[in-house]
């Protein structure tokens, strides 16, 4: 699944393998994917901003194109 097309429901966490896979990830928008900082390297079009580690995973993770 394309990282940008990945849904982003609230209240959970995200994982990555070959592409970004959001599994109940907490983020501001449900139209973009959301990954924790450690997923940046595999989520090519997904960037985490506003926090790092647990803080980013918690609620400050956002996705840009």
UniProtKB/Swiss-Prot annotation:
Binding site for a divalent metal cation 2: 8, 14, 16, 27
Modified residues (Phosphoserine): 33
Binding sites annotated in the UniProt record for a divalent metal cation 4: 42, 46
One GO term (biological process): negative regulation of cell growth
Binding, a divalent metal cation 5: 34-35, 48
Chain intervals for the UniProt region annotation (Beta): 1-30
Protein keywords: Acetylation, Copper, Metal-binding, Metal-thiolate cluster, Phosphoprotein, Zinc
Superkingdom field: Eukaryota
Statement: the UniProt record of this protein carries the keyword Transferase: no
Annotated region (Alpha), positions in chain: 31-65
Modified sites of kind N-acetylmethionine: 1
Binding site for a divalent metal cation 3: 16, 20, 25
One cellular component (GO) term of this entry: synaptic vesicle
Family listed: Belongs to the metallothionein superfamily. Type 1 family.
PANTHER family: METALLOTHIONEIN, METALLOTHIONEIN-3
Name of the molecule in the record: Metallothionein-3
Organism: Ovis aries
